[in-house]
A protein has these predicted regions:
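Short, mixed-charge, low-aromatic patches
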Residues: 1-5, 86
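C-terminal functional extensions of proteins
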Residues: 37-137
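A short helix->loop->beta-strand "cap" motif at the edges of active sites that frequently abuts
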Residues: 18-22, 104
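A generic local secondary-structure boundary/capping motif
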Residues: 11-14, 49
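Generic beta-sheet signal
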Residues: 25-27, 62
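Short, catalytically relevant binding-site loops at active-site mouths
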Residues: 1, 29-33, 66-67, 114
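Charged helix-capping and loop-helix junction motifs
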Residues: 4-12, 38-43
Length: 137
């Protein structure tokens, strides 16, 4: 969990005073005990709680597929994760807009890759690099 990295003394203060871009790359798949049914707004609320800051991140990078779209495109992978009580974390335009209206920039992009063995979802490093280059310039 990334939350434990935010708990040491001084991290919240550093986040508040830093002028750096603070970027959150969301999970691709829910974790039953951590991010099950998380929305972008829920991410923001949890990060606010543990950092005690209004804007613990100002950019959110997430997949460009909603959960429904993913399940239609990759039904065999969705079923495999469902057997583990997990699901793809992709969101609707309305769910993303809810966070955007709070001042968080949304970068919804093709950032996933599927492993050839076992059909597992991973953040694709090359795809993420393109998104980071776009953000950072």
């Amino acid at each position: 969990s990334v939350i434990s990295n935010l708990l040491p003394i001084g991290i919240s203060d550093a986040l508040m005073v830093s002028s750096a871009q603070k970027i959150l790359v969301t999970n691709l798949v829910s974790n039953r005990n951590q991010t099950h049914h998380f929305t972008p707004d829920r991410y923001l609320k949890v990060f606010r709680k543990y950092t005690h800051t209004e804007f613990p991140f100002n950019i959110l990078i997430c997949p460009n597929l909603s959960q429904n779209s993913f399940e239609k495109r990759y039904p065999h992978i969705a079923k495999s994760y469902a057997l583990e009580h997990a699901h793809f974390l992709g969101w609707t335009v309305n769910e993303l807009d809810a966070v955007s209206r709070k001042g968080i920039k949304i970068e919804s992009s093709d950032i996933i890759s599927i492993t050839p063995h076992l059909n597992r979802l991973r953040h694709d490093p090359q795809k993420l690099a393109r998104v980071f280059k776009k953000i950072i310039g």
